[in-house]
From Swiss-Prot:
Compartmental location: Cell inner membrane
Protein name according to UniProt: Na(+)-translocating NADH-quinone reductase subunit C
Transmembrane feature ranges: 13-33
Record carries keyword Magnesium: no
Source organism: Haemophilus ducreyi (strain 35000HP / ATCC 700724)
Role of this protein: NQR complex catalyzes the reduction of ubiquinone-1 to ubiquinol by two successive reactions, coupled with the transport of Na(+) ions from the cytoplasm to the periplasm. NqrA to NqrE are probably involved in the second step, the conversion of ubisemiquinone to ubiquinol.
Length: 257
């Protein structure tokens, strides 16, 4: 049997290949081991943002305890606005990619530029100490300049007044479009009305929009396209193809909960 010569070309290549395989196994193992922790952190961040949109997130808030006490997740059929109970393992992103669980959006209706959406959405009823519904937090996403922007919007029982918003996932330009994640800008949405007297989506984000005290929010300076993306997201998700049917029913029932 020939003696292994690590200094030969073939020996060097063998060592490199073995080291590469070992490193790959280490990285793969680490990814598998870390995934449960990453999933927990992702879920915790989601809960934190839901609480933040609802105005329940404070400096010393225990996220998991507060979420469990005051938030009730529900699955909604967007076409009817009804709650559904038989949707297992709901994942909005995964459902939106599956033809069996998604809806193709007509180009003329696709204001948020998302092309497909899940047939269902998870909404979050916010309860008080007595178990009464005080608001609902709705997921919202749409394209900005560089990225898909994911956020939450809290709406009061009148199904019209914004109680808060937050963006938790986006890749817009830092210091410009990335300011959609700035709490100071997000506060400018509080108290704004989503709809006009004709029940049309009237909330508008753009340059000088705050002149309309009831419906307007000034866009971000130097981030016109990102601001337009936020505006378009509201126009789509609160219209008839988004949460429009659900909000009509929420308004009719929230006061009775």
């Amino acid at each position: 049997m020939a003696k292994f010569n690590k200094d030969s070309v073939s020996g060097t290549l063998t060592v490199v290949v073995l080291l590469s395989l070992i490193c790959s196994l280490i990285v793969a193992s680490a990814a598998v081991l870390l995934k449960p922790t990453q999933d927990i952190q992702k879920q915790l961040d989601k809960q934190k943002n839901i609480l933040q949109a609802a105005g329940l997130m404070h400096e010393n808030t225990n996220v998991q305890e507060t979420y469990a006490k005051f938030i009730e997740p529900k699955i909604v059929d967007l076409a009817t606005g009804d709650y559904v109970e038989d949707v297992a393992n709901f994942d909005a992103k995964a459902f939106a990619k599956d033809p069996a669980t998604s809806v193709a959006i007509k180009p003329e209706d696709d204001k948020a530029n998302i092309r497909m959406r899940a047939k269902y959405a998870e909404v979050y009823l916010v309860k008080d100490e007595m178990g009464q519904t005080t608001q609902v937090v709705l997921p919202m996403y749409g394209n900005g300049l560089w990225s898909m922007m994911y956020g939450f919007v809290a709406v009061q029982p009148d199904a019209n007044t914004v109680n808060g918003i937050t963006y938790y996932e986006q890749g817009e330009t830092a210091g410009l479009g990335g300011e959609i994640a700035n709490p100071n800008w997000q506060k400018s949405f509080v108290g704004k009305k989503l709809f006009n007297a004709n029940n049309e989506v009237a909330l508008t984000i753009g340059k000088g929009a705050s002149a309309d005290k009831e419906h307007g929010v000034d866009g971000l300076s130097g981030a016109t396209l990102t601001s337009k993306g936020v505006d378009n997201s509201f126009k789509y998700w609160f219209g008839t193809n988004g949460f429009g049917p659900y909000l009509a029913k929420f308004k009719a029932t929230a006061g009775a909960n």
